[in-house]
Amino acid sequence: MAALSLKGVKKSYGGAQYVLHGIDVDIADGEFVVLVGPSGCGKSTLLRMIAGLETVTEGEIAIGGRIVNALEPKDRDIAMVFQNYALYPHMTVAQNMGYGLKIRGVERALIDARVQAAAQILELGPLLARRPRELSGGQRQRVAMGRAIVREPSVFLFDEPLSNLDAKLRVQMRLEIQRLHARLATTSVYVTHDQIEAMTLAQRVIVMNRGDAEQIGAPVDVYEKPATTFVASFIGSPAMNLLHGRLSEDGAAFDVADGPRLPVAGAAGAGRGIAPGREWILGVRPEHMTPQPGEAFATLAVDSCELLGADNLAHGRWGAHDVAVRLPHAMRPTRGETLPVALPARHLHFFDPATGKRAG
């Protein structure tokens, strides 16, 4: 195991345009960090640079205190798990898991011992004599993880390993990866576009956007205090409702652009840096909009209602803004019904319209 450090890491492909704009992060020994963001944000490029599959244009990458910029992937003491498994079809599970050690000249007895140990961790014992074509998608991904485990690396790198699996298998594999990290405590960097994977697996999340690390923090902090409108809209399913408008001079109401006046008394409290009488982007998550007894509320004309099982999502519009409200299972408003909607001050977020950055 080892700490991983990125200092001012930039990437360009020969021109003036950078695809990574200076990433700075220190990942502690044994920490599980997830790089999350949409396609094209730079997360996979950054992972490939850590792995040594892409060169570093500027900055330094260090593993265990050793700068690895000039080292080949095989010399970085890393192991990588890919989206497409990358198993040899003519080899058995055991041979696939041990092949990386074999080509490095490791003794057969040690290879067998490590393969057996990894198979026990991943419950692959009964499958060791099978070939990849005889395995399910989830089993193949466990074999790919086993191949990484037998290396006993300082750092695990996961490149969207669950993308090829169906929804049920993704849930199962998330749990297995959590258990694996709890058992091995190996420094891990995991890339995904799926914010649910990021929230459930990470000790810290790095939200990537257009080559920048938009926010770095614990999943709960990123969810509860998004640093920008991008993070607010990307982390959370459904996304945070973001409303353009103006806070009244007394700070008690928010006038949605081309929409209704909303009661927000107490939202611009002392010390939050939220000036009344100016334009803001107001954010509120769908689960925080169900009114409690005695609360002031606005109303929303329901366009549709999604029945999700444990809860429901009502959808409507305020002006040009789509609005989603999460409701208890028993609340199922129909199209055209008027729904009372709360905007509790403690759950409101304000963002600067010019920069998209959080206030307060």
From Swiss-Prot:
It comes from the Bacteria. It is a peripheral membrane protein. SUPFAM superfamilies: MOP-like, P-loop containing nucleoside triphosphate hydrolases. GO terms for cellular component: ATP-binding cassette (ABC) transporter complex, substrate-binding subunit-containing. Coiled coil: none annotated. Gene3D superfamilies: 2.40.50.100, Nucleic acid-binding proteins (2.40.50.140), P-loop containing nucleotide triphosphate hydrolases (3.40.50.300). It is found in: Cell inner membrane. It catalyses: sn-glycerol 3-phosphate(out) + ATP + H2O = sn-glycerol 3-phosphate(in) + ADP + phosphate + H(+). Residues 4-235 form the ABC transporter domain. GO terms for biological process: carbohydrate transport; glycerophosphodiester transmembrane transport. The complex is composed of two ATP-binding proteins (UgpC), two transmembrane proteins (UgpA and UgpE) and a solute-binding protein (UgpB). Part of the ABC transporter complex UgpBAEC involved in sn-glycerol-3-phosphate (G3P) import. Responsible for energy coupling to the transport system. This is sn-glycerol-3-phosphate import ATP-binding protein UgpC. The gene is ugpC.
